[in-house]
Amino acid sequence: MAFHHNHLSQDLSFNHFTDQHQPPPPQPPPPPPQQQQHFQEAPPPNWLNTALLRSSDNNNNFLNLHTATANTTTASSSDSPSSAAAAAAANQWLSRSSSFLQRNNNNNASIVGDGIDDVTGGADTMIQGEMKTGGGENKNDGGGATAADGVVSWQNARHKAEILSHPLYEQLLSAHVACLRIATPVDQLPRIDAQLAQSQHVVAKYSALGAAAQGLVGDDKELDQFMTHYVLLLCSFKEQLQQHVRVHAMEAVMACWEIEQSLQSLTGVSPGEGMGATMSDDEDEQVESDANMFDGGLDVLGFGPLIPTESERSLMERVRQELKHELKQGYKEKIVDIREEILRKRRAGKLPGDTTSVLKAWWQSHSKWPYPTEEDKARLVQETGLQLKQINNWFINQRKRNWHSNPSSSTVLKNKRKSNAGDNSGRERFA
């Protein structure tokens, strides 16, 4: 799904909605005899089966909605009532009835005969160019049906004008662009924005035609139903695309990681060795120039490009960002809990300054033997307001911190230990 030549393109064939989902519309009244043959050559278009989003290098239509010409060729090749009925039965899903053409045959005759002369201003030439484009597609089917080509071109332009003037057009456009943005490379996303900036020109192109044809058609429930179903279809398609990209991108990254681990276990060399942990800007520019030089080239063993292309780099960067976002969302609560626990322990480990000053004063006054008795500890508990466990821990940590800085206390402790050991050995001898 890529974006090419400054227009939104997407090859979508939506086969979800078939003819069996919607009951056939009521049959239109028979047309007058003088126009029956004329309108059989241009059967009513079916919205969902023929409104395909396709790319065209020579056509810059914004929505790329085209009416297929295969059904027109089939219907025009035979003038029998049975073939016309078969073509109408094949296009039952959301097909537009041609009864409004029969009810307004005088207006239609003037519109078809004069082209789109009623449209004034600069939009006249643009719509006529659109009609010429539509007519050019039908010339290769055998030719000779100029009136039918004019009707089809008029219907194409008018259908687009109705879509652009519909209240759900903005939602339809947003859903379509959202589908395009999912798998479009990062370096091509600005093209979509540039095309969206030109949407006002497309609206202005068909606004005059919509105003001219406003009196021909009243409330169109079929168009409302089509727009509603199509917006829902695009939203569902967007969710499927997102799931596809996330799942398969995760699988691809995990597969690459497993391959790297296997290579590291076989060779004993990590992927970062020999290339440096980081690269400067000059090295980045050199790599980009090398990539431009060797893009599309195969190495000696035929394992593909020597250096990843720009599209591959953008895809890897996109996957990396998606994984980073997923990891943050998955482990956000745990990370917050761990951080709060660490901060709480830090706050709990630090005693207030006034209490530590009292303990340090007692430590300095008893530096030769910094081991408080139970009476000293009880008095310190009353003076500082701390718990007995906190005072014991503070003295233990303080003795560890000053173990080598107070040789007198260590000497006294060693002598006391020796004397205690001598007394115990003497008792054992005389026992």
Curated annotation (Swiss-Prot):
GO molecular function: DNA binding; DNA-binding transcription factor activity
Polar residues compositional bias, start-end: 404-413
Major site of localization recorded for this protein: nucleus
CDD domains documented for this protein: homeodomain
GO biological process: cellular response to cytokine stimulus; detection of cytokinin stimulus; response to light stimulus
Ranges of residues in domain ELK: 322-342
Family: Belongs to the TALE/KNOX homeobox family.
Name of protein: Homeobox protein knotted-1-like 3
A Pfam family: KNOX1
Native organism: Arabidopsis thaliana
Compositionally skewed regions (Pro residues) per UniProt: 22-34
Region (Disordered): 15-47, 402-431
Compartments where found: Nucleus
Name of the coding gene: KNAT3
SUPFAM superfamilies, sorted: Homeodomain-like (SSF46689)
Cellular component, GO, one term: cytosol
InterPro entries noted in UniProt: ELK_dom, HD, Homeodomain-like_sf, KN_HD, KNOX1, KNOX2, TALE_homeobox
DNA-binding region: 343-406
Swiss-Prot/TrEMBL keywords: DNA-binding, Homeobox, Nucleus
